[in-house]
């Protein structure tokens, strides 16, 4: 699949989607994107910057949601202009799709909305690549139907990615079943693993979600060893002070060290091939 000027897939080098959970300021967005670009350029990793203009599914209405669509899109457009990186952001309603698609390079659908047919259809018809997050409530094999809806809407174009972000396992807990990554490859779409939301503890701090960022490298390594097209990681210069999803954000200062390991793993795994495809 062609994505932002490069090829992605199970037979292509690992690519990265990364950035702060929510836009906190234009200055921080530009600085973070610049540092990530420097890191990924040095490591030869294709990179897409991610940040949200609105966190529409916060646990509480007392927590920070973001700048809103209009101001947020202006900031993301400025990040692309100044830093020179492609941009991905979430879209939350059908009405937002044309406005967001006019600015960013890749649309992302929230996991909670993966079963909303009209919403998925609108995103797929936008003309932009779409990263569809698998719902925490959905079996990996059920993503075939989600992809079918999207492909029927976009005329069968290769513009759809699917993203694993953990499965609900009791209250306030997510787990990652690495078999799901192989199952989702059967959609014939690039598979992305969200290593940071997979360690989230939804609603685990009462009015906001908790997380266990120490397990981000554990799951990221396992996913890359299983075989994925890309990795998604939210990162922050100071996760303890992040306005959204700080407990599961990976520290920006540790991003290069983690990516070095993931790139090495990716090369080994993809060079060896996938013997599971032979049985």
From Swiss-Prot:
Its EC number is 2.5.1.55. The keyword Transferase applies. The keyword Cytoplasm applies. It catalyses: D-arabinose 5-phosphate + phosphoenolpyruvate + H2O = 3-deoxy-alpha-D-manno-2-octulosonate-8-phosphate + phosphate. It is found in: Cytoplasm. One of its GO terms (molecular function) is 3-deoxy-8-phosphooctulonate synthase activity. It comes from Methylobacillus flagellatus (strain ATCC 51484 / DSM 6875 / VKM B-1610 / KT). Pfam families: DAHP_synth_1 (PF00793). Keywords: Cytoplasm, Lipopolysaccharide biosynthesis, Transferase. Disulfide bonds: none annotated. GO terms for biological process: keto-3-deoxy-D-manno-octulosonic acid biosynthetic process. One of its GO terms (cellular component) is cytoplasm. This is 2-dehydro-3-deoxyphosphooctonate aldolase. NCBIfam families: KDO8P_synth, PRK05198.1. Pathway: Carbohydrate biosynthesis; 3-deoxy-D-manno-octulosonate biosynthesis; 3-deoxy-D-manno-octulosonate from D-ribulose 5-phosphate: step 2/3; Bacterial outer membrane biogenesis; lipopolysaccharide biosynthesis. It comes from the Bacteria.
